[in-house]
């Protein structure tokens, strides 16, 4: 048996990545000891990117997990991880266009290996860039929540006003 709901080691699936914004905090499946032994283990805190189906989507793992060949791991890099995450996010639309179609979209690892990116030499600058972009992500998330709440309020107002439950004095 490959799966074990009581295991603390997750099995990363494309659907887990698709619903994750930046940090993956859980997976829908967990692996048994046998599953772990026959998979590639990725400890928490690693940068992972999907290369099949939903290609080019990066995440940072907040849990221990195992991956299949539909993912690549970026570890041992001499770059601040959050900075590299944002570089990959910037490349995501381009890689989506360059994915090879078959039964499902795939991204050639050679394309990843040969992609050149500009990385500031200063880790302080890398951190500053990543912090600015992370702060902007937080602002966007807050605005999206506010927009969602405003839409719900409008929907309620439409229900009240357009059905005659609430009358306006004019």
Locate each region found by the language model.
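Active-site/binding-pocket entry motifs
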Residues: 17-18, 54-55, 94
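Short, Lys/Arg- and Gly-enriched loop/turn segments at beta-strand edges
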Residues: 56-61
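Short peripheral tails and domain-boundary helices/loops at the edges of structured domains
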Residues: 68-86, 167
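Amphipathic alpha-helical coiled-coil/heptad-repeat segments
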Residues: 119-170
């Amino acid at each position: 048996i490959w799966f074990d709901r009581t295991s603390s080691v997750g099995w990363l699936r494309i659907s887990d990545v698709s619903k994750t914004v930046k940090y993956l905090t859980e997976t829908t499946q967990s692996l048994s000891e046998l599953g772990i032994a026959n998979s590639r283990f990725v400890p928490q805190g690693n940068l992972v990117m999907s290369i099949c189906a939903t290609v080019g989507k990066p995440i940072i793992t907040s849990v221990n997990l195992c991956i299949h060949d539909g993912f690549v791991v970026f570890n041992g890099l001499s770059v601040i991880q959050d900075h590299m995450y944002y570089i990959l996010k910037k490349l995501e639309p381009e890689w989506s266009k360059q994915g090879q179609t078959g039964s499902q979209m795939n991204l050639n690892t050679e394309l990843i290996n040969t992609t050149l990116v500009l990385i500031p030499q200063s880790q302080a600058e890398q951190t500053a860039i990543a912090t600015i972009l992370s702060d902007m992500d937080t602002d966007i998330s807050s605005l999206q929540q506010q927009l969602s709440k405003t839409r719900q309020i409008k929907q309620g107002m439409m229900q009240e006003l357009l059905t005659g439950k609430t009358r306006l004095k004019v």
